[in-house]
Amino acid sequence: MAEQKKQLLIVTGMSGAGKTVAIKALEDMGYFVVDNLPPELLGSFWELINNSSDFSKAAVVVDLRVKSFYKDLVDEIKSLEDSQNVQSTVLFLDASDDVLVSRYKETRRLPPLAHTGRLLDGIQEERNILSRTKNISNIIIDTSHLSTKELKTKLVDKFGDNRTRTFSIEVMSFGFKYGIPIDADIVMDVRFLPNPFYIPQLKPFTGLDRRVFDYVMSKKETKEFYAKFLDMLETAIPGYIAEGKEKLTIAIGCTGGQHRSVSIARQLAVDLAKKYPVDISHREISRYIGQ
């Protein structure tokens, strides 16, 4: 079986066209990313990646420093094409002059070649230098009318894989007395629900026990709350997915994380799993099991 070629993505383009957004998006997709790599080191970088089993895909972001910089980049890219183990793609990010001027004014920064302080002169000089690189690029994305979210979506569509596009949910129960989970995206306080703690026959058990679960979920207050909570989540989750979120953590909390939060988390995981991949965890459960 032929050895699968490793992927090398070379990201370049106009300053202010979105390379910073591209870095973050590619890292989220599992790329090993190096920013501002000098072109003369491209071959050495690829040799390092190609000889390592830790990286299956890598990206380099090349920044304009001097006028000869991009001449070197094109030469290095062409030399890489002779390698039998490299599958390289050149991504060029572009934007119109007026959009770039507007972006620079918002950030109060100057293009790298705006030596006289004139924005448009610096942009036009950079565009002239980059023309050769743009001509050899495999993919050109004009970001003039793209939001950060839209650019990220385009990058995921072009360079992501099925794994990176998978959205998943973690449902966890916890006890407020032990602190709110710092990684939670949504925190729901269910301390207002009827508490099995005050039922002697149920107090020793947890929401993993059928008796406790049935007690919590059968209450009128629970039914009314849960129906609205589930409806809210089913409305909100598609929005999280549209924003590019890959994992949503929903934390359900009661006083000690023993009865109510565990019961609600169990039911929520079952219902959300009908549409999405769901993992469930009970942060405090070890405090009560085996007592």
UniProtKB/Swiss-Prot annotation:
Alphabetical list of SUPFAM superfamilies matching this protein: P-loop containing nucleoside triphosphate hydrolases
Q: Which of this chain's residues are annotated to bind ATP?
A: G13, M14, S15, G16, A17, G18, K19, T20
Look up the signal peptide feature and give its range. none
| Binding, GTP | D63, L64, R65, V66
Keyword terms = ATP-binding, GTP-binding, Nucleotide-binding
One short Pfam name that applies is RapZ-like_N
Tell me the domain of life.
Answer: Bacteria
Which GO-annotated molecular functions does the record name? ATP binding; GTP binding
Concerning PANTHER family, the annotation shows: RNASE ADAPTER PROTEIN RAPZ
Write down the HAMAP family for this protein, in alphabetical order. Answer: RapZ_like
Give the record's family classification.
Belongs to the RapZ-like family.
Stated role: Displays ATPase and GTPase activities.
Stated name of the protein: Nucleotide-binding protein LJ_0866
Which organism encodes this protein? Lactobacillus johnsonii (strain CNCM I-12250 / La1 / NCC 533)
